[in-house]
Amino acid sequence: MKVNKLKGKIVENGMSNPQFAEAIGMNYSTLLRKFKAPEKITCVEAEKMRIALNLKADEATEIFLA
């Protein structure tokens, strides 16, 4: 996962990290751990993030599968 691209999309969508965590139903501290260990993100979590950020398929692929 490209953490910096994901963080950029969070900002582009006018959210803070705590707001994003709430939007995807994740504890803020858990989100921070996911940022530090991006290989531990699940498919379900990636899909929730994609939906919360209104990412197109190609954007999601670039962020989560790179």
PLM regions and their residue ranges:
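Short, basic-rich loop-to-helix N-cap that marks the start of a DNA-contacting helix
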Residues: 38-51
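Short C-terminal boundary/hinge segments that cap the last helix of small helical domains
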Residues: 54-66
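The alpha-helix within a helix-turn-helix
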Residues: 10, 21, 50
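Short alpha-helical DNA-recognition segment
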Residues: 14-33
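Residues in the recognition helix of alpha-helical DNA-binding motifs
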Residues: 9, 23, 34-35, 63
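A short, Lys/Arg-rich alpha-helix, primarily the initiator
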Residues: 1-15
